[in-house]
Amino acid sequence: LEEGEITSKVKFPPSSSPSFPRLVMVGTLPDLQEITLCYWFKVNQLKGTLGHSRVLBMFSYATAKKDNELLTFLDEQGDFLFNV
């Protein structure tokens, strides 16, 4: 990192909740100029909802104009997709 850059780490504890962990920022950051996503995942079974092309959302970045400005997800075939 260079001087003045902002970095954060977030650790989600195990959850017995049926909903996925969610991080909501309190306050604001400078406008997003670039982003790096890096994660590892292993999917044992995909259960799609009839009529939905997205089965498992992995990451979503919302803006004031659009809920899923950046979205990574797995589709019914198990393909990893990135939408901007």
Curated annotation (Swiss-Prot):
Protein family membership: Belongs to the pentraxin family.
Record keywords: Antiviral protein, Calcium, Disulfide bond, Lectin, Metal-binding
Biological process terms in GO annotation: regulation of defense response to virus
Cofactor: Ca(2+)
Subunit structure of this chain's protein: Homopentamer. Pentraxin (or pentaxin) have a discoid arrangement of 5 non-covalently bound subunits.
Annotated cofactor note: Binds 2 calcium ions per subunit.
InterPro entries: ConA-like_dom_sf (IPR013320), Pentraxin-related (IPR001759)
Domain notes from UniProt: A possible carbohydrate binding site is located between positions 14 and 20.
Residue numbers binding Ca(2+): D67, N68
GO molecular function, one term: carbohydrate binding
Further comment found in the protein's record: Displays strong antiviral activity against the rubella virus (MIC=7.2 ug/ml), and relatively weak activity against herpes simplex virus type 1 (MIC=44 ug/ml) and the rabies virus (MIC=32 ug/ml).
Name the UniProt record assigns to this protein: Limulin
